[in-house]
UniProtKB/Swiss-Prot annotation:
Its EC number is 4.1.3.39. InterPro entries: 2-IPM_HCS-like, 4OH_2_O-val_aldolase, Aldolase_TIM, DmpG_comm, DRE_TIM_HOA, PYR_CT. Mn(2+) binds at residues 17, 199, 201. This is 4-hydroxy-2-oxovalerate aldolase 3. GO terms for biological process: catabolic process; L-leucine biosynthetic process.
Length: 345
């Protein structure tokens, strides 16, 4: 397919998905610095919230350094051209959170559900559309549903009022042909005016290849993060994606040099550890496990003596999905007992 001249919208995840490896502890200064760099580089849409979306601050998901209100009210007034989005997971975020984000100047809301549970998004998508927001349905863990199944779920979200639907590879499990199959099927089923997006992770180092495959199959919104800062082995690295798009003639509107500088000079120094395809992140992609489980599994390894890799494989076998973080500890405890490892009461 000829992609030269095709325009796409790149959507930055550094300040939302990037909160996972930061344990949601990014400072306001760090947020400001990165957001202003992204804005100056020409990134049109920047997501800002707790890693698990609006209202994510909790014992289950982790308490952030600042509230969603503080992060959003700090970043939004500084933006010269970029718009700011927020993620919302029904059951974590509420319509009140949605209203708060709208009042602070968030223009895009992304309502995220597991890829078989679009029906739980109706209230939030409907509310966002009534507020006149750019309203996105976000189908997570898309490898756990067939192309036909994703079509049904995407059409539900479109019917509730979503003007864009995302196929989301939360585990970094999909390969380019699987991305193409899913994106092409959803594209064919949605109204022509409904936009289609893809969100990739780099656990099998396929983030960029999968994103290009998605564009080839009809996606026009693509998620990425500067230096890949995100759950697991990170998101699709923005600076690499932009460079590849430039080579292919795909128009992103992002400056290829400035985004490299944001990644290298602003984001890499923020990292508490290198975001790379290490043994455990690779296991996420191989076993199809939700990306933000990685740090929980590493913590459980220290506590219970079960290698994170073994735990992640078991979580994949059990079909655990986003929102079941509390089950990671339970699974580790069960495995430790089965292996005769003594665990302190």
């Amino acid at each position: 397919m000829e992609l030269k001249g095709k325009k796409i919208t790149v959507h930055d995840m550094t300040l939302r998905d990037g909160m996972h490896p930061k344990r949601h502890l990014m400072t306001l200064e760090q947020m400001k610095s990165v957001a202003q760099g992204l804005d100056a580089a020409g990134v049109p849409l920047i997501e800002v919230t707790h890693g698990d979306g609006l209202g994510g601050a909790s014992v289950n998901y982790g308490f952030p350094a600042h509230s969603d209100e503080e992060y959003l009210s700090t970043v939004i007034p500084l933006m010269k051209q970029a718009k700011v989005s927020a993620l919302l997971l029904p059951g974590i975020g509420t319509v009140d959170h949605l209203q708060m984000a709208h009042e602070l100047g968030v223009t895009t809301i992304r309502v995220a559900t597991h890829c078989t549970e679009a029906d739980v998004s109706e209230q939030h998508i409907t509310a966002a559309r009534k507020l006149g927001m750019d309203t996105v349905g976000f189908l997570m863990m898309a490898h756990m549903n067939s192309a036909e199944g994703l079509v049904k779920q995407a059409k539900l979200m479109e019917g509730y009022g979503a003007n864009c639907v995302y196929v989301t590879d939360s585990a970094g499990y999909l390969l380019p042909d699987q991305v193409k199959e899913r994106i092409a099927a959803v594209r064919a089923a949605l109204k022509p005016e409904t936009e289609l997006g893809f969100h990739g992770h780099h656990n099998l180092a396929m983030g960029v290849a999968n994103s290009i495959a998605a564009v080839e199959a009809g996606a026009n919104r693509i998620d990425a993060a500067a230096a890949g800062l995100g759950a697991g082995a990170g998101n699709t690295p923005m600076e690499v994606l932009v460079a590849v798009c430039e080579r292919m003639g795909i128009e992103t509107g992002v400056d290829v040099w400035k985004i490299q500088d944001v990644a290298e000079d602003l984001v890499v120094p923020l990292m508490d550890f290198p975001i790379r395809v290490d043994r455990d992140a690779l296991t996420l992609g191989y076993a199809g496990v939700y990306g933000s489980f990685l740090l929980f599994a590493k913590r459980a390894e220290k506590k219970y003596g079960i290698p994170a890799r073994d735990l992640l494989v078991e979580l994949g076998r059990r079909g655990m999905v986003g929102g079941q973080e509390d089950m990671i500890e339970d699974t580790a405890l069960t495995m430790a007992r089965a292996r005769g490892i003594k665990v302190a009461a």
